[in-house]
Amino acid sequence: MRCKEKAMAIVLGGGKGTRLYPLTMDRAKPAVPFAGKYRLVDIPISNCINSGIRQIYILTQFNSASLHNHIANTYVFDTFSNGFVEILAAEQTNQTDTWYQGTADAVRKNLKHFHDQDADYYIILSGDQLYRMDIKDMLDQHIASGAELTIASKPISREQATGLGIIGCDEQGFITKFYEKPANDLDISEYKVPASYMKDSLGKEVGENNEYLASMGIYIFNAKTMEEVLNNNKTDFGKEIIPDVIKQRKVSAYLFEGFWEDIGTIKAFYETNLDLASISPQFNFYDEQMPIYTHRRHLPATKVNFCNISNSLTSEGSIITNAYIVNSIIGVRTLIESGASLDGVYCMGASYYETEEEKAENTKKGIPNIGIGRG
């Protein structure tokens, strides 16, 4: 899948990640380990690459060293390609001496870098979501509709609508209104998706489980439109820019029916990860047509000695001895010693193996070794 049109992706990842603390204590949110061997940022980047979009910027601000290392070691395109994955960290210049004030402000302050690519379309993606999407299909619809902005939209139930931004559209799929996180007792029936548009887009009937549309925080802008709507002091896409654009310009909804989850909280992070270890997970990492890419670590296969392991994922480079593990995920280079019992555990893994000398030093200091000790 190759894009004939010049499209460029921008992954937003510069927030403090306070809802994911302490996982974001020393690293940016997109660099948080996920599913044992991946990083959160691998999801949007992989979706772009699988869709033929090879010019990708990652916007960061906090604790970006780990993210820089991951990107540099993972996404290296060949010499004869014009593709790249490049990190743009917040910077102070002669024109501005403030950090990113929000998602829109982050994009605005980097427009000078984007201009070099002469893109026709800007694709805005989040760095903390799990989904698999052919972005080329969304781009094709955006161009065909003649819209200035297209918003990826997930059909949901009324119960789910409370925590999301809700979109109202007409029978042609053009967005007419937007409501941010409606209360449970609020009547939002006017926001129900038209049955004809649901049928035309997804070939499905409207029911209680899909009668409303939630914004996924994934946008495709015409390049000129995005520069125009950012020519102000507004700082946030979801709260300020998008509602104003809907009122003033032609905005289309792209319906997406696949799995999609925001992983911005500890609860969502934990539950989404453990679901991956279930017999029939909602998201399938075993897709050869649209794989999720990550850093090739060149680690040996996991060694399992006298263990009872079920409904779990074990990542490469781990050594597990005489342990009971169920409904859990074991990260890379994890050492689990005899007698340990893990149920419903996400073990993040390690960046390196400790030497015998380091372990002896740990004993002297009275601190544990990396990994899980004897049970």
Q: Which residues make up each language-model segment?
A:
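Short coil/turn connectors at secondary-structure junctions
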Residues: 5-7, 53-54, 82-83, 118-120, ...
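Short beta-strand segments
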Residues: 12-13, 124-126, 152-153, 179, ...
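Left-handed beta-helix
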Residues: 1-8, 13, 196-209, 223-375
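Conserved N-terminal catalytic core of the sugar/cofactor nucleotidyltransferase
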Residues: 1-11, 19-28, 33-141, 169-171, ...
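Conserved core of the sugar-phosphate nucleotidyltransferase
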Residues: 133-220, 232-233
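Proline-centered turn/helix-capping motifs that create local helix->coil transitions or kinks
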Residues: 74-83, 171-179, 184-188, 278-285
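Short acidic/His/Gly/Ser-rich catalytic and metal-binding motifs that mark active-site loops
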Residues: 17-22, 186-190, 355
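Conserved beta-strand termini and adjacent loop/short-helix elements that scaffold enzyme active sites
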Residues: 88-90, 152, 254-256
